[in-house]
Amino acid sequence: MPNARTGSLLALAGFGLATAGAALYGARYSRGKRDGWYRDLRKPSFTPPDKVFPVAWTTLHALIAYSGWRVWSAAPSRQRNAALRLWISQLAANAQWSKLFFGKPRPTLALVDVFALEGSIIAYIAAAHKVDRPAAYAFVPYAAWVAFATVLNAEILRLNPQLS
């Protein structure tokens, strides 16, 4: 019979796998797209170099998994369950953005999705804060990055009206 520590490590691995699965789902749509239509778009001057994105997202995905695991590890409660539902919703919205922006490509729908993503992140932070403060704080860099991504998405649409 597994002990509590083993169960906790398995849960952490599960959150890591769920987060990695969402990341891989999104990556399958963005892989190679940066060389196609995206490369030819007008982009704002503050667009980071392509090499920044994998570093940022790897760090953020680790924080996403860690935060979800911390909330899951808290004592069962309605607040914990509400936070976990929000964790799942942000993960789903996160996975959809790359499909909408790069896969379709439908940057206007991607902008709607990223607004929903940011809203679910903020709601998760508020819910997680009631359950486990470090879990909530772990999401702050993610919220900041997604806010930046929202501005970037909106600016790409503004600079490329043919995409609307």
Give a label for each model feature:
Residues 1-164:
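Short amphipathic, positively biased membrane-proximal segments
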